[in-house]
Design a protein with these regions (language model features):
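All-alpha RGS (Regulator of G-protein Signaling) helical domain and cognate RGS-like helical scaffolds
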Residues: 2-346
Length: 346
């Protein structure tokens, strides 16, 4: 058997894809208006203010309801405060209310378990906080279509983060989103970018997502082969089927836009040797974590009608990564805003 070609190695999006490829191709709707001497009002400001208000309600919930034993409520609240800061970035200080100050119980005992995550046992207080987290996630998803590309990407990431918080608080995971069929508005006779609102950058991002799903399907074949016949292998089969469905969805959508879907490579180079069940579990977590970045970029690249599909795919990958033992990320799929120097304006 010949070794994988250079094309094969480069096509392994999950293992070698750089997260900035699509982000660099998208632009927001801000900047000076023609003929104006200064920046025009940020059209994302109303969306940001709504998201900040929803986050403030959640912070107040953490100050009112105690976290259950074994859950780091203070840590979840601190992450939520970081979400608020990211959402308020760029808003005039006079337009943003002061954030809630911690006054009530949020601290539970820090988690002591390691390995694949398990949910806390539901309690009345847990249900209250978890419901607030899920409500905040839904509010962010509801505003995807009203946001500019970068803000939509952030909202999708935060919706996934709040769903992870709800899982940590004991809420059952939401049902996995069913991959939709290709939009009827795009016909097979169309050329790339000819369908309403779909340009070349969006088609490129869809091809990247398709390539990543090809790699995930291959990767889960390796995962399943290294796991014993137990619930973990059942989880791997379920994930394998989910990624096949996503792959098929992107193939249909790309075809409907008049482009040729990228084929799967003959083989893929794994990020590390997979010789045991522990290695297989680690690979599954790696696959899902890498996919969150792919789908965050897709949210920013596609037009509004397709953003929710990409955002739900991001959420599902984040939940599966957690199930496989990956640590929860404060900003799934996107760089931590606190680690990125803020741009200055003159």
């Amino acid at each position: 058997m010949q070794p994988p070609s250079r094309r094969t190695l480069l096509s392994l999006g999950l293992f070698t894809l750089t997260a900035c490829t699509v982000a660099a191709c998208t632009t927001d709707r801000t900047g000076p208006a023609p003929g104006a001497t200064g920046p025009r009002p940020d059209p994302d400001a109303p969306v940001r203010l709504r998201a900040v208000a929803a986050t403030d309600a959640l912070l107040t919930g953490y100050d009112t309801l105690p976290a259950p034993p074994g859950v780091d409520g203070a840590g979840l609240r601190a992450e939520t405060a970081r979400h608020r800061a990211a959402l308020a970035e760029g808003l005039p200080a006079t337009a943003v209310p002061s954030p809630p100050v911690t006054t009530g119980p949020t601290a539970g005992a820090p988690p002591t378990t390691a390995g694949p995550a398990t949910a806390a046992a539901p309690t009345p207080a847990t249900d209250g906080l978890a419901a607030l987290e899920l409500r905040t996630a839904e509010s962010h998803l509801a505003d995807l279509d009203a946001a500019g590309p970068s803000l939509a990407r952030l909202l999708a990431s935060l919706a996934a983060a709040h769903t992870l918080h709800a899982a940590a608080l004991g809420a059952p995971a939401p049902p996995l989103a069913a991959p939709p069929t290709a939009s009827a508005s795009a016909t097979p006779a169309a050329t790339p970018g000819e369908a309403p609102g779909v340009g070349a950058a969006a088609v490129t991002a869809l091809q990247n997502a398709l390539g990543a799903e090809h790699a995930a399907v291959y990767g889960y074949g390796v995962v399943g082969a290294r796991l014993p016949d137990d619930p973990a292998r059942t989880d791997a089969r379920t994930a394998y089927a989910a990624h096949q469905a996503r792959r098929d969805t992107w193939q249909r959508l790309i075809t409907s836009l008049g482009a040729a879907p990228a084929p799967a490579a003959g083989g893929y180079q794994l990020p590390f040797p997979v010789a045991s069940a522990a290695d297989a579990t680690r690979l599954a977590a790696h696959l899902e974590t890498r996919l969150t970045g792919v789908y965050a970029d897709l949210v920013a690249a596609v037009p509004a009608p397709h953003r929710l599909t990409a955002a739900l795919a991001l959420r599902d990958c984040a939940l599966r990564a957690r199930r496989w033992g990956a640590p929860d990320q404060p900003f799934p799929g996107v760089p931590d805003p606190a680690a990125t120097p803020a741009a200055t304006t003159g």
